[in-house]
Amino acid sequence: MFKIPDLRKRILFTLAMFGVYRLGASVPVPGVDLEAVQRLTDSGSQAGIYGLLNLFSGGALETFSVFALGIMPYITSSIILQLLTVVIPRLQKLQEEGESGRKVITQWTRYITVVLALLQSTGLTYIFSRGSLTGGISLIPNYTPSRVGLIVLTMTAGTAFIMWLGELISQRGIGNGMSLIIFASIISQLPASFGGAYQVTAGQGRLGQFSFLVLMFILMIVGIIYVEQGQRRIPIQFAKRVRGRKVMGGQSTYIPLKVNSAGVIPVIFATSVLFFPALIATSLPQDNSITAGIRNWIDVNLANSQGTSWFYIFFLGMLIIFFTYFYTTIQFDPVRQSDMIRRQGGFVPGVRPVSYTHLTLPTICSV
């Protein structure tokens, strides 16, 4: 593999970008109380909404670094544009224009990413100054406009830098840059997770429990890979057409339908949605019994539930299921795909006449 110069350069470039990303994840935002950040790290609060946000940021949120927002604003921006493509004809036409249209959509995605980063960084700054999501530990002393502005601009610039890194990896590295950054973020948390599990189990003489956890982790990885690689292939046959003296078409191909075509995107989007109730709860006044009750309920069941509240588990699960269904529908439109196949003279073998293909493909996708 390393004997191929171009492949070697791409691998080394990707690893170098990973190093830059991990370096930025350890640089704290100016204006943050580092002692409070250390207390938060020592407390080990890694569950609930805070734990999910910290996971996808690669631990950058735990240290309140310049990359604390991670790649989540970009993912949210991409999903928003894909949703708008369904309802705005102009965006749909741009998507069908090929490379030139994709460049315009990519540019709009960048603009929306910066706007979302400004909004999310402002919300996180406000929440962390009030001690929400952090067990009452305030990370930002002296909550002044100048300090808040500095923190917000720094975190927004960090998100823009991560977006640029992802695009560089896509162009000069291996694979999709944004997906690899998410992968690097999650992988970076494994040593600390295994270290904590070892201290709790093997460090207290329960080596069997630690071995069982490692075995279950490996089996889960194997199972995830198995499901991720699973696909249903729908055979497509193209009819022969005569143009002059040439016979066109007649070849066979297939449409690969993945079992999990949405990937981890619905989980990220659901986590972003869960962030807003915590922000609203922080803004509610406590001098009123009704608003104080609502705020306490959100804190117990969502913001600081540590992932054990039944409502948190149910609500997050429903959000993931909804966004998975919705995102899959947007990613692959069976009706449009069927029309394209029909216009090109293709059909599903065993399904005649050709006009029935537009009914067959959506039915298979629903199953």
Residue map of PLM features:
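Conserved small/polar residues in nucleotide/adenosyl-binding loops
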Residues: 357-363
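N-terminal cationic and glycine-rich segments that engage phosphates or anionic surfaces
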Residues: 1-93, 100-356
